[in-house]
Amino acid sequence: MSVSELYFIKILFLSIVQGVSEFIPVSSSGLLVIFENILQLKNNNLLINVTMHGGSLAAVVLFFFKDLINLWNNHKLLSNLIVATLPVVLVGGLLQYLGIIDQIMNIAVIGYATIFFGLLLFFSDKNKEEKFFTKSISHKDSFIIGLYQVLALIPGTSRSGITLTGARFLKFNRVDAAKFSFLLSIPTLSAAFVLGTYEIYKLEETSFNTLSLFAFLFSFLFSLATIKYFLIFLKKFSLNVFVIFRIFLGIILLTFYYTTH
């Protein structure tokens, strides 16, 4: 197998990891750190990163296409999504401008955050009372979930995980909480895709190629499958399996960090 073929396989594997981990309550950044080291691949390819996120964005838009079309008639859901999105836009924009996010992007932070927010997910999922978004959600609830989403700016938190945590603490049922979390991912994924595309445009010499097309396709397919089957999973099971996974993942990351520093 040639070097280029091996690189192709590695990128496709990372695309699968991106597609799956984007929509379940695990640390996608933690998983990528592990697999990038196992595969001896530091994925600093901006084009690949953008197309992978583009694949996840296309998947969630397709899955919730009817809901998105009906947003103009469902003013309550639209306004709640806007309210929940504003905190992360404002805080994230400020932190990005100050360069703080890049400063805290390291394996130790990812490891500790993976464990801590995994435990927080565990306690939030203990709520027995379950409310439904369509009947009970208020702008106050949406704003609180939006504040939880701000914590996703900490590497290792998991955006889907922390919004699920916030919704479960507010006693919303798992499936509705997940759907709201997925809809909330659209603005953040869109922002990442647009900003990334702009950076690619500024580079000028970067052009889309076969590898980026496959990265998009694999991320899209696995994102779509993950959304569908995760919602089915939540109808029958608790989030404990993801809590356990996060704790083990965090331990692996911290062990790797402290044995190499």
Label each region the model flagged:
Residues 1-261:
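Multi-pass membrane proteins that catalyze or facilitate reactions on polyprenyl-/lipid-phosphate substrates
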